[in-house]
């Protein structure tokens, strides 16, 4: 299969709309004033906000009106999407075609949230029944554990779940369980990912072997960090339980497809939850990897989470480009990245429950689009993936917002708020203060404050320029009604399809991650060198020096 079989161009810069956008940027884009655009067009907000309605009737408003665009720019961006055949690649993904060209795989995480049970095919096989079978297994298992029907080796109920994984097997479940903490039930969940022994050691200090269930999350069951941590957990468990391997069956489950290795580890293969090769790690929270989520919030809430994502999938596949919310988000990202030279993208949730959301999106975006070679196997002559970062606000306002407001870099930003708090304490005082900052930050970034305003407020002399805000800094405001499982599912799927749109325009494969391989290979070599006491001289002078100093101090 040709690596370029889904697109008819090698480089995005070859597309006529790209040249058109470059001319528009030079003639008006770089001097466009959002404040003036609002003055010129009383209906700008009306035209540039889009409301998504979820399967349960809840709504999320996406306000794009504070972005550096006008009707002509939006039209040219839509033209770019058409020329890049974003919809063709999208449809190929939803048909189960092998759009992961470098690994010759389908990209079918969307099939995991196909709760309508439509037939969805990969290589001629309808995968919907298998997806349903795994979900049914997850439902039965999670309900047994949560109800107390599933008991540990001494007959006690499970109270704690420890998920051991890394990358997508960790970031997704961590973020989702934190975001949906309000829906937590009877179990406490803990996550171990880092190979640093501190992570597993500190976790084992706070759990009881009689009442703890370990989930080992590794598709291949060979991931070095995960299996090392899993073996440490198993050794700890056996040391506390009389070294009887038969007890493992009640306290360990595997989220994996490698039945041989799972059985060798000692886990009963009945407690094995599989997923297919067409599920990428950073898209795996919808799969068996989400078992910790189902255990924590209950299966019904987990299903609502899936349905929220499915609703965005339906919107993405069925909505015309002009009103297609994820597509517009992706096009704006390309506009800033490739024409304004923006290198970063800020996501600031005004919601403490979403405090891990930026870290999750960081992997989604940067592992997907941190590429420099196109589907046509040529190096790009344009910038691709942005550096995505963020922290929850209002904390973020007291750390890096200074640079966003008055620094020398353009940082397009997404602000996220839920109108209804799960904790409306003090007669909603906290929520109103939070919301006032959400609205004020976006407004301040847009309108700024000029020299005349600063002087009118009493500033004089050399202090004046320090108090000037240039404004005209773009934001997208995302206002949900409430953070529910369905809302969270929708927000994640929105960003997945934003990332997809970016990658389609840049003509890169957003679904591999070859960049993680070289470091792993070198780490294996160095790992062996750390097992002996001899002085190392096989690397460059810096690496040799660091290794030898480490060995001396270890």
Swiss-Prot record:
Record key words, sorted: Acetylation, Cytoplasm, Gluconeogenesis, Glycolysis, Isomerase, Phosphoprotein
Family listed: Belongs to the GPI family.
Any one GO biological process: gluconeogenesis
Quaternary structure and interacting proteins, as annotated: Homodimer.
PANTHER family xrefs: GLUCOSE-6-PHOSPHATE ISOMERASE (PTHR11469:SF1)
Mechanisms controlling activity: Strongly inhibited by the polyol (sugar alcohol) phosphate D-glucitol 6-phosphate (D-sorbitol 6-phosphate). Also inhibited by the polyol (sugar alcohol) phosphate D-ribitol 5-phosphate.
EC id: 5.3.1.9
Active site, per annotation: 367 (proton donor), 398, 520
Reaction it catalyzes: alpha-D-glucose 6-phosphate = beta-D-fructose 6-phosphate
Functional summary from the UniProt entry: In the cytoplasm, catalyzes the conversion of glucose-6-phosphate to fructose-6-phosphate, the second step in glycolysis, and the reverse reaction during gluconeogenesis.
Note: Present with 91600 molecules/cell in log phase SD medium.
Class of this enzyme: isomerase
Positions carrying Phosphothreonine: 53, 220
NCBIfam families xref list: PRK00179.1
Taxonomic superkingdom: Eukaryota
Membrane-spanning segments: none
Main location per the UniProt record: cytoplasm
SUPFAM superfamilies cross-referenced by the UniProt entry: SIS domain
Record-given protein name: Glucose-6-phosphate isomerase
InterPro entries (UniProt xref): G6P_Isomerase (IPR001672), G6P_Isomerase_C (IPR023096), Phosphoglucose_isomerase_CS (IPR018189), SIS_dom_sf (IPR046348), SIS_PGI_1 (IPR035476), SIS_PGI_2 (IPR035482)
Source species: Saccharomyces cerevisiae (strain ATCC 204508 / S288c) (Baker's yeast)
């Amino acid at each position: 299969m040709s690596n370029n079989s889904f697109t008819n161009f090698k480089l995005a810069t070859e597309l006529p709309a790209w040249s058109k956008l470059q001319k528009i940027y030079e003639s008006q884009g770089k001097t466009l004033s959002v404040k003036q655009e609002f003055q010129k067009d009383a209906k700008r907000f009306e035209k540039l906000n889009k409301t998504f309605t979820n399967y349960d009737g809840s709504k999320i408003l996406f306000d794009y009106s504070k972005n550096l665009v006008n009707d002509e720019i939006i039209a040219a961006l839509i033209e770019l999407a058409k020329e890049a055949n974003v919809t063709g690649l999208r449809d190929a993904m939803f048909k189960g075609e092998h759009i992961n060209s470098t690994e010759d795989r389908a990209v079918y995480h969307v099939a995991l949230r196909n709760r309508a049970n439509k037939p969805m095919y990969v290589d001629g096989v309808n995968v919907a029944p298998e997806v349903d079978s795994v979900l049914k297994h997850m439902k039965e298992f999670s309900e047994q554990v949560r109800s107390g029907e599933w008991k540990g080796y001494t007959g006690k109920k499970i109270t704690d779940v420890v998920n051991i994984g890394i990358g997508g097997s960790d970031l997704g479940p961590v973020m989702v369980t934190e975001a949906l903490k309000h829906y937590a039930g009877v179990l406490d969940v803990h996550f171990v990912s880092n190979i640093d022994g501190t992570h597993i050691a500190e976790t084992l200090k706070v759990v009881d072997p009689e009442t703890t269930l370990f989930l080992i999350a590794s598709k291949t069951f060979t991931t070095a960090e995960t299996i090392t941590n899993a073996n440490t957990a198993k050794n700890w468990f056996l040391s506390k339980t009389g070294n009887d391997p038969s007890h493992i069956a009640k306290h360990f489950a595997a989220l994996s497809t490698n039945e041989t290795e799972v059985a060798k580890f000692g886990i009963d293969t009945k407690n094995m939850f599989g997923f297919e090769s067409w599920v990428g790690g950073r898209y795996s929270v919808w799969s068996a990897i989400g078992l910790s989520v189902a255990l924590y919030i209950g299966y019904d809430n987990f299903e609502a989470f899936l349905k929220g994502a499915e609703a965005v999938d339906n919107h993405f596949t069925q909505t015309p480009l002009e009103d297609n919310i994820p597509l517009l988000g992706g096009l704006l990202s390309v506009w800033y990245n490739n024409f304004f030279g923006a290198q970063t993208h800020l996501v600031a949730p005004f919601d403490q429950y979403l405090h891990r959301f930026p870290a999750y999106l960081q992997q989604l975006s940067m592992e997907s689009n941190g590429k420099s070679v196109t589907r046509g196997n040529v190096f790009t002559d344009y910038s691709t993936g942005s550096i995505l970062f963020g922290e929850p606000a209002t904390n973020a306002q007291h750390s890096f917002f200074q640079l966003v407001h008055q620094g020398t870099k353009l940082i397009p930003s997404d602000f996220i708020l839920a109108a209804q708090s799960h904790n409306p304490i003090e007669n909603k005082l906290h929520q109103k203060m939070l919301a006032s900052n959400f609205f004020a930050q976006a407004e301040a970034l847009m309108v700024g404050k000029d020299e005349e305003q600063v002087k009118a407020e009493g500033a004089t002399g050399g202090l004046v320029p320090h108090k000037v805000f240039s404004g005209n800094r773009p934001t997208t405001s995302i206002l949900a009604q409430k953070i529910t499982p369905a809302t969270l599912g929708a927000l994640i799927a929105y960003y997945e399809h934003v990332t997809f749109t970016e990658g389609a325009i840049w003509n890169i494969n957003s679904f591999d991650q070859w960049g993680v391989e070289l470091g792993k290979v070198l780490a294996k070599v160095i790992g062996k060198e750390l097992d002996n006491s001899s002085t190392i001289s096989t690397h460059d002078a810096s690496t040799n020096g660091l290794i030898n100093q480490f060995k001396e101090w270890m």
